[in-house]
């Protein structure tokens, strides 16, 4: 794999289950593949459970295990034109309503790109993926508007183009407003150079932004910039966001800025990663201005392409106060095992 693809794969820290999916049917024009993962996750939060604090996280081990199942289909319509469909469901180990349909879309594609409709990715996720490379933690300053993230009622385009050995990826999507009038859009571009440097930028807007208990109805606006560099077994990346009227901790934040830094080192079958995440309310002061502030480290060992184990620890730098609960300021330790198929 060349350097530009390593950068896009973020140092192999997250192997997609689609990449290991098994083809269960194929003929001269069509194919069908099934994939997914089984992932056991034990989370220990560094909080005294006996304290009478609202939304306190338990100091006992919490089971966050999950299963994902996906089905992908593709058929050739003409020599240069094809149709695709994809579905993915996630099931939680908890007896709750947390099961989620992650993807459900179909569309068409050619050498000029792919256009799909349904529940599909928005356009800013490929930028937050620059730093969202950990097995469990991270991505705390990469919160996105729903229209820029994975969402339904979504018409999405992605195109990837080779430019003399470099690669340009362009994404754009439009989310149609329903009864909640939350229509929006996002667009982004990413350029990956064969020498290991990658960078990108994007922008998104969405109507109907409001806090959980408020009556606000504002237009959220969000801009991202990202950069990465891969050299030998090392990967470095950074992300910056500037936002207006976005929801954080169920509160509508008028103006916020944030950034993330990530570094990864691959040693044989092991990958070691550290990230720093910071997000602040630009109009607040003192401790109340800090919405996210943490350092995380993890290590993952890949036994083969299908099975891995990992350990991850988050050092939460927030202090519990009137605007931050003890749970939101808690450290976390996670042990996990994952089987991809």
UniProtKB/Swiss-Prot annotation:
Gene Ontology MF term list = porin activity
CDD domains linked: gram_neg_porins (cd00342)
* Signal sequence region: 1-21
Please provide one cellular component term from the Gene Ontology annotations of this protein.
pore complex
> Which InterPro entries does the record match to this protein?
Gram-neg_bact_OMP, Gram_neg_porin_domain, Porin_dom_sf
Topology within the bilayer: Multi-pass membrane protein
Q: List the disulfide bonds.
A: none
**Keywords annotated in UniProt:** Cell outer membrane, Ion transport, Membrane, Porin, Signal, Transmembrane, Transmembrane beta strand, Transport
Mention any Pfam family matching this sequence.
Answer: Porin_4
Q: What induces it?
A: In response to elevated hydrostatic pressure.
A single BP term in Gene Ontology: monoatomic ion transport
Tagged with keyword Membrane: yes
Task: Name where it's found.
Answer: Cell outer membrane
| Known role | Forms pores that allow passive diffusion of small molecules across the outer membrane.
- Subunit organization: Homotrimer.
Family of this protein:
Belongs to the Gram-negative porin family.
Q: What is this protein called?
A: Porin-like protein L
Native source organism of the sequence: Photobacterium profundum (strain SS9)
